[in-house]
Amino acid sequence: DVNELNDVEERRAVVPQVWEIDIMITKHNDEIIQIEER
């Protein structure tokens, strides 16, 4: 949905810290998953 996408972009513009933290958490979780797969 284009409107939903625009809402997300607007929220990111207002609070860039939030999605940066989300990305850090995602990367952290990916690393944990990789460690568990070994």
UniProtKB/Swiss-Prot annotation:
Coiled coil: none annotated. It is found in: Secreted. Its main location: secreted. The keyword NAD does not apply. O-glycosylated. Contains sialic acid residues. GO terms for cellular component: extracellular region. Disulfide bonds: none annotated. Homodimer. Keywords: Glycoprotein, Milk protein, Secreted, Sialic acid. This is Very early lactation protein.
